[in-house]
């Protein structure tokens, strides 16, 4: 059974917890008799976060009150065909009393690409592991930054394990500085349940240039790209379906970052004061270094040339193609400095939050 049900009076935070515990991406909102009132999807929650809803808000404020659903009697193949046509990941199955029997996921009948009822939308993943990690020296004098250990496991091994868990088995790792340490450890990836191919950067190619060295003929569907210094518990399948359902060319995962201004801020128009806001907080969505990219965009990246992800974003926007942001509520950190490395190690040793695989 895929059914996860909550009350309309439960909070958004409760819905997030229910999704994370169940490894699902859709919860049914029901009354006391189990009659469907609406649904809350992983995407609904993330769109609410973009709109600055508080996590203590009742789910009745963000739920879809007219959801797509199935009546009993359809085959699994028929339901999957309908979901795919409508670019929907999942839908509840109702009985004649409008009570929820189950939730059908588009990946439920596919072998080899499912995890907990989910199907990966990604044809491949690329781990960008070619950086030097200069700010972490001397720790990186003879070791690439992604091979640094946090909680007894290297950063990049955590990524490989997470990708495998989410059904993403086709992995490319871009390497340059001390790249042999990575290839010697993972080899072909078979001992980790994945297939790994290495992309050698002979020179610095920026944050996206190495993608031009990957043949898009070796996989189908969009690619997942993740920086090699990121530790996260993001649900890659939720990210993939968010990208798919929004029909985007490129999707950017982003973390909420709050800046507290320690002073009263004067609001003005020219020399005229309009008011004072005492010690305001500003919220920003910051790039998490995780992307979903349609495979045809790879051919638009200059071959073996320096090219940053910001350049790719600008190109897609210039071509008037769609880019969406995927706000994360999962654990995330990037290991860019010694202080960040030490903080992550302390978090894992204290088991702060649900950060272990």
What kind of region is each of these model predictions?
Residues 246-256:
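A short, conserved acidic/glycine-rich loop-to-beta-strand motif
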Residues 5-23, 30, 49, 69-88, ...:
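The conserved cystathionine-beta-synthase
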Residues 45-60, 107-122, 285:
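A short, polar/charged loop-to-alpha-helix boundary motif
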Residues 1-4, 11, 57-67, 140-143, ...:
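Bateman (tandem CBS) regulatory domains
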Residues 224, 231, 237-244, 257-260, ...:
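Catalytic-core segments of class I nucleotidyltransferases/pyrophosphorylases
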Residues 153-227, 238, 303-304:
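Conserved N-terminal catalytic core of the sugar/cofactor nucleotidyltransferase
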Residues 19-22, 27-44, 83, 91-109, ...:
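A glycine-centered beta-loop-beta connector
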Residues 117-180:
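N-terminal glycine-rich phosphate-binding loop and ensuing alpha1 helix
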């Amino acid at each position: 059974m895929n059914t996860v049900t909550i009350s309309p009076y439960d909070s958004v935070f409760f819905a997030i917890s229910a999704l994370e515990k169940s490894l699902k991406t859709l919860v049914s909102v029901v009354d006391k008799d189990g009659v469907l009132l609406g649904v809350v999807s992983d995407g609904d929650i993330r769109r609410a976060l973009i709109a600055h809803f508080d996590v203590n808000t009742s789910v009745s404020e963000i739920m879809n009150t007219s959801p797509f659903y199935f009546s009993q009697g359809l085959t699994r193949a028929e339901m999957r065909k309908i979901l795919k046509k409508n670019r929907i990941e999942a839908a509840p199955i109702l009985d004649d009393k409008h009570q929820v029997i189950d939730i059908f996921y588009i990946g439920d009948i596919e072998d080899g690409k499912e995890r907990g009822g989910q199907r990966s939308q990604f044809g491949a993943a690329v781990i960008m592991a070619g950086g030097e990690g200069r700010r972490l020296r001397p720790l990186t004098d003879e070791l690439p930054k992604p091979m640094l250990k946090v909680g007894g496991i290297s950063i990049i091994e955590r990524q490989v394990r997470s990708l495998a868990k989410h059904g993403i088995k086709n992995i490319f790792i871009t390497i340059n500085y001390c790249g042999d340490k990575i290839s010697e450890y993972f080899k072909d990836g078979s001992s980790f349940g994945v297939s790994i191919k290495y992309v050698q950067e002979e020179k610095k190619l920026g944050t996206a240039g190495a993608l031009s060295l990957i043949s898009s003929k070796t996989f189908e569907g969009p690619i997942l790209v993740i920086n090699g210094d990121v530790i996260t518990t993001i649900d890659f399948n939720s990210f993939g379906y968010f990208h798919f359902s929004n029909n985007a060319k490129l999707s950017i995962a982003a973390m909420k970052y709050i800046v507290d201004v320690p002073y009263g801020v004067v609001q003005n128009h020219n020399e005229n004061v309009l008011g004072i806001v005492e010690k305001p907080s500003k919220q920003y969505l910051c790039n998490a270094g995780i992307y979903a990219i349609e495979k045809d965009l790879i051919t638009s990246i200059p071959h073996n040339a320096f090219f940053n992800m910001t350049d790719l974003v600008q190109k897609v926007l210039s071509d008037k193609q769609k880019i969406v942001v995927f706000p994360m509520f999962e654990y995330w950190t990037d290991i860019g400095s010694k202080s960040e490395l030490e903080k992550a190690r302390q978090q894992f040793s204290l088991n702060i939050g649900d950060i272990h695989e």
